């Protein structure tokens, strides 16, 4: 799980308050509310959860122009690369039913595009921090949700 070491580090950090949610859509709404109250939230979410949270992201954070950056851990990207597949693979029935593909990864980026969420994908751990910082800065500058997809393990 890419998120586990990150949650451990965040939970131990003295100046970060970790707020967990029961559902991913709830996390989006809570972050938008925190932003509205003057906080600077960062949503940490797996790409499967991103797909579940669509209505909250569209109907709350995006519509209100909430500067809420998302760190999206990229389930399925390693498996996709191992199978020789790129994120822009045509999403045909044959592709989506392949047993060697976790379709979460190839659906993540088109979904963000459809929702109008700017994103950047990082596939190497050494660039993860810079990618996340760019998403945070972009959210603040553009006053909208943004995303950093971390498609590599974080140690």
Regions found by a protein language model. Name each.
Residues 1-155:
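Thiamine diphosphate
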């Amino acid at each position: 799980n890419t998120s586990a070491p990150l949650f451990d580090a965040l939970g131990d950090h003295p100046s970060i308050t970790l707020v967990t949610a029961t559902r991913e859509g709830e996390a989006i709404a809570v972050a938008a509310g925190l932003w509205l109250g003057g906080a600077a939230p960062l949503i940490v979410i797996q790409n499967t959860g991103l797909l579940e949270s669509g209505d909250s992201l569209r109907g709350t954070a995006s519509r209100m122009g909430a500067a809420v950056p998302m760190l999206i851990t990229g389930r399925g990207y390693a498996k996709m690369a191992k199978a020789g597949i790129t994120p822009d693979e045509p999403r045909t029935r044959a592709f989506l039913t392949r047993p060697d593909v976790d379709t979460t990864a190839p659906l993540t980026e088109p979904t963000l595009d459809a929702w109008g969420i700017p994103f950047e994908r990082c596939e190497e751990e050494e660039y993860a921090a810079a990618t996340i910082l760019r998403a945070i800065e972009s959210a603040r500058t553009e006053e909208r949700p943004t995303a950093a997809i971390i498609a590599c393990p974080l140690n």
